[in-house]
A protein has these predicted regions:
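Glycine/threonine-rich beta-strand-loop-alpha-helix active-site module
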Residues: 2-3, 7-101
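Phosphate-handling active-site elements
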Residues: 34-43, 199-201, 219-222
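Generic hydrophobic alpha-helical segments
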Residues: 1-5, 149, 242, 246
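Mobile late-domain/C-terminal helix-loop "cap" segments
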Residues: 211-254
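Buried hydrophobic packing segments
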Residues: 24-29, 125-126, 146-152, 172-176, ...
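Glycine-rich phosphate/pyrophosphate-binding beta-alpha loops
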Residues: 67, 175-206
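Carboxylate- and glycine-rich phosphate/diphosphate-binding segment that chelates Mg2+/Mn2+
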Residues: 74-182
């Protein structure tokens, strides 16, 4: 991708597709002006400061799925095929300059992929809200992202041509990526190695791990989960009620 960028004298990248497509496009824009290997910029410590910031190409992001929210993220997740490890490559300028959210582009997404990417968006919003630390803006964004998913995910899966549902899911996905600047959790910590080793869709593995991680973390997140229940106006506004909501959502999406 970088060779093609240079060969054609490009001056920017339009990253088009799902999370993987967007991440690769962002990585090409980033690496087009770097001399070090991409792995030297893994999101560890201040590695990002090694980059030549002036040589990072501008990025326009056009997502065609509603899951990763990579269009509002400052990183790319790239699989190192030699090690089998999914590495997070970070730089503030990974954040696209322009994002185009067009629900028409997601209408043809199959129901199973709509469900899996939707659960990825839910995991982002949920883990961001439950992450420790004080970030009221991220918390507010995450809560509203979960409300949109609660209202629109099942509709987007069952009626893929519903433009309103598709637009709201795109919005929720972008909100999730924005919110998780606060942090993520064990759902993603468990998912990434499983995805890399077994080629399981990231959203699917998030959905699998979600209720187990919630239960494991009950003692430290219960108060936050009850606030989520209140915001989503669930019938059973308890920790167990929320876990049952997740289980019921998974069952309906299966």
């Amino acid at each position: 991708g970088v060779d093609s960028y240079k060969k054609n004298n490009c001056d920017g990248v339009i990253a088009f597709g799902g999370g993987s497509g967007l991440d690769v496009g962002k990585a090409i824009a980033f690496m087009s002006g770097q001399n070090l290997p991409i792995w030297d910029f893994e999101d560890v410590g201040d590695n990002w400061t090694k980059a030549n910031s002036d040589k990072i190409a501008p990025i326009i992001a056009v997502p065609t799925t509603a899951g990763t929210g990579s269009e509002t993220g400052r990183a790319s997740v790239i699989l190192n095929e030699e090690t089998g490890v999914k590495n997070i490559i970070f730089h503030p300028k990974f954040l696209p300059s322009i994002v185009i959210l067009d629900p028409i582009l997601t209408v043809g997404l199959p129901a199973k992929m709509t469900a899996a990417t939707g659960m990825d968006a839910l995991a982002h919003n949920l883990e961001a809200y439950c992450a420790p630390g004080y970030h009221p803006m991220a918390d507010g964004i995450a809560l509203e992202g979960m409300r949109l998913i609660n209202k629109w995910l099942l509709e987007a899966v069952s009626n893929g041509s519903n433009i309103e549902a598709r637009m709201n899911m795109l919005t929720a996905a972008s909100m999730g990526s924005t919110a998780f600047q606060k942090g993520l959790g064990a759902i993603h910590s468990l998912s990434h190695p499983v995805n890399a080793l077994n080629n399981i869709h990231h959203g699917l593995s998030n959905a699998i791990f979600m209720p187990y991680v919630l239960t494991f973390n009950k003692d430290v997140i219960e108060k936050k989960i009850i606030k989520i229940c209140d915001y989503l106006e669930l019938k059973d506004r308890s920790f167990d009620g929320f876990v049952n909501w997740v289980l019921d959502l998974r069952k309906k999406l299966d």
